[in-house]
Amino acid sequence: MKVQEYISSRREGRPLHFTLLDPGKTSANDLITLAKQTAEAGTDGFMVGGSTDLSLENVDLAVETIKQTTHMPVILFPTHASSVSGKADAIFFMSLLNSESRQFLVGVQIASAPWVKKT
């Protein structure tokens, strides 16, 4: 099932909850524990990201760990183009609209486009 279909089917009549897990601040063992606990508590899926210094390897490992632990979608919450992983189920393609910096308004999105297209 595609992530969009999953979200649409889950949100009928209720709000959804997605847990943000930051591989820059959480060990692999803690990711397993947190994924299990939040899945049991009723989260609808997971977002991976947060820290600005994440490597692709850290993001890939986090996504793989969460997907092996649960059967819920893993959506990237990227802070930089270099942390776009093809192992995730989806990506939030965001734009920071309250910035005066062109880099944050469109630059990062332009830099991310080739990675998104590849995956």
What spans do the regions from the language model cover?
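Alpha-helix-loop-beta-strand connector modules within alpha/beta enzyme cores
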Residues: E57-S82, A111-T119
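Short, acidic/polar
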Residues: K25-T38, T79
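Hydrophobic faces of well-ordered beta-strands that scaffold small-molecule active sites
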Residues: H17-D22, F46-V48, V74-L76, I91-F93
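N-terminal amphipathic alpha-helix/helix-capping segment at the start of soluble metabolic enzymes
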Residues: M1-L21, K25, A113-K118
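Conserved anion-binding
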Residues: S83-T119
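Short, well-ordered coil/turn segments that N-cap beta-strands
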Residues: G13-H17, G42-D44, T70-P73, K87-D89
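Glycine-rich, proline-tolerant flexible connector loops at the mouths of alpha/beta enzymes
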Residues: M47-L61
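Active-site beta-loop-alpha junctions enriched in small/polar residues
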Residues: L20-T26, S51, T79-A81, L96
